């Protein structure tokens, strides 16, 4: 049986940190030690920020983004193009597109992708809400910004079928050679998609 080297409060902190993505037990222990050593400069502000997050962060009832206001900052921004809705699986995908300044459209977060093996079906996603939004006359294009995985593509096909009766253009992100990518290191599927979706130079 492994012996504990710290009191129960510190062990609890380590256990909670180890639940975070990318942090195993060893990384969690290092993070806990760092927080404890920087108690005033780091731990107290972090605890305060977490308390604010618990009290104020909510899910946007329009798009599914998380924010401290509802509708969220993006949905409330009049500079956003109301004609375009970018569909993503998760809030992290929305944030990635925002960091890249990839679109001035609005978003719709599905909450996941269809995955029969994980028991995730259409009823677990916000597809019905997307269909309702797509029927608003000012919406003209739905961009499917879903991962190029089996689950992502299955979801894209399902969403496209559900949007058949809406008077919108449905597009998806191009797949292919990444910026700075070398052909020799790319998988066959990526190369095949890049060749099929080639554009004029």
Curated annotation (Swiss-Prot):
InterPro entries: DNA_Rcmb_RecR, Rcmb_RecR, Rcmb_RecR_Znf, TOPRIM_dom, TOPRIM_RecR. SUPFAM superfamilies: Recombination protein RecR. CDD domains: TOPRIM_recR (cd01025). GO terms for molecular function: DNA binding; zinc ion binding. A zinc finger (C4-type) spans 60-75. Keywords: DNA damage, DNA recombination, DNA repair, Metal-binding, Zinc, Zinc-finger. Pfam families: RecR_C (PF21175), RecR_HhH (PF21176), RecR_ZnF (PF02132), Toprim_4 (PF13662). It comes from the Bacteria. Residues 83-178 form the Toprim domain. GO terms for biological process: DNA recombination; DNA repair. Belongs to the RecR family. HAMAP family: RecR (MF_00017). May play a role in DNA repair. It seems to be involved in an RecBC-independent recombinational process of DNA repair. It may act with RecF and RecO. This is Recombination protein RecR. It comes from Afipia carboxidovorans (strain ATCC 49405 / DSM 1227 / KCTC 32145 / OM5) (Oligotropha carboxidovorans).
